[in-house]
Amino acid sequence: MERIYVIPLRKAKNVPRTIRAPKAVKIVREFLMKHMKADTVKLDESINEKLWERGIQKIPPRIKVKAVKDEDGVVEATLEE
């Protein structure tokens, strides 16, 4: 199964400045676990670089992700261009 999601990261703006980027990574992972019904989510390095490109405090408001679920139920997510 392959899907493209636009994941909102507004909830990460409501945490202290110094933990916004790590919180955004958790939000992306939890979003994909919920919507793809998977227990294991592997995030590509490109997603991590996009969330951290402006530092820990200034995260993007949303991120576009391509998620692919294999037969084992593992979701691999990459940044959609």
From Swiss-Prot:
Keywords annotated in UniProt: Ribonucleoprotein, Ribosomal protein
Example GO molecular function: structural constituent of ribosome
BP terms from Gene Ontology: cytoplasmic translation
Keyword Protease: no
Highest taxon of source: Archaea
GO cellular component, one term: cytosolic large ribosomal subunit
Entry-linked Pfam families: Ribosomal_L31e
The keyword Ribosomal protein is assigned to this record: yes
Family (UniProt): Belongs to the eukaryotic ribosomal protein eL31 family.
Protein name: Large ribosomal subunit protein eL31
Organism: Methanothermobacter thermautotrophicus (strain ATCC 29096 / DSM 1053 / JCM 10044 / NBRC 100330 / Delta H) (Methanobacterium thermoautotrophicum)
